[in-house]
């Protein structure tokens, strides 16, 4: 029996690269979609927010002399490319995917309309949210927090390269331990990197829990959805 009825899954663009240095690794995206399909078959409603770092990062663009807002818009377009790839892979895997963009590109993807997104979720379709919040200066983490709150998700699942939040960097400190659960205030007090401050504050204010887990661990998404000890739960 799943622990959640409706989830918001945040995938980083980098996660789609697999072992590649750039772009979308086919085997990686297929495996991720298989994990998502497994969860939807359990009756869980799934919405996804996808990043764009495998193609372009607005923050990086801003640091090399490009106007930050322009760089961020480029980053948003990168997320649309990822969302289309994800939606296409989902369709091929037998899922019904709907890509919705926060910026209008009507000939390519439909615009984000909240009641429509909710309807799709109720119908068992997977909704992929593209183009972040549609505004520059906001990360896709913030988009995940925002969309999670808007659709009434019970939890935001942040899929990363590490399998949770640690007391220190596990690569540098062999004594570092993984937290099973931690409060929002403890994360701030210990100065731990979970997600960017805006996204984090939004989740805290909305009492929307966050689960940090590794997307590269086979079956991790299913275990998280089943409420098993996987990753780190950040709660009020």
Curated annotation (Swiss-Prot):
Source superkingdom: Bacteria
Main subcellular location: cytoplasm
Reported regulation of activity: Inhibited by UTP.
Keyword annotations of the record: ATP-binding, Cytoplasm, Kinase, Nucleotide-binding, Pyrimidine biosynthesis, Transferase
UniProt: ATP binding residues: 10-13, 53, 57, 160, 166, 169
Gene Ontology MF terms: ATP binding; UMP kinase activity
GO biological process: 'de novo' CTP biosynthetic process; UDP biosynthetic process
Reaction(s) this enzyme catalyzes, per UniProt: UMP + ATP = UDP + ADP
EC category: transferase
EC number: 2.7.4.22
Keyword Transferase part of the UniProt annotation: yes
Keyword Kinase: yes
Subcellular location: Cytoplasm
Pathway(s) annotated for this protein in UniProt: Pyrimidine metabolism; CTP biosynthesis via de novo pathway; UDP from UMP (UMPK route): step 1/1
UniProt GO cellular component terms: cytosol
Binding site for UMP: 52, 72, 133-140
Function per UniProt: Catalyzes the reversible phosphorylation of UMP to UDP.
Family affiliation: Belongs to the UMP kinase family.
Subunit comment: Homohexamer.
Protein name: Uridylate kinase
Upper classification of the organism: Bacteria, Pseudomonadati, Pseudomonadota, Betaproteobacteria, Burkholderiales
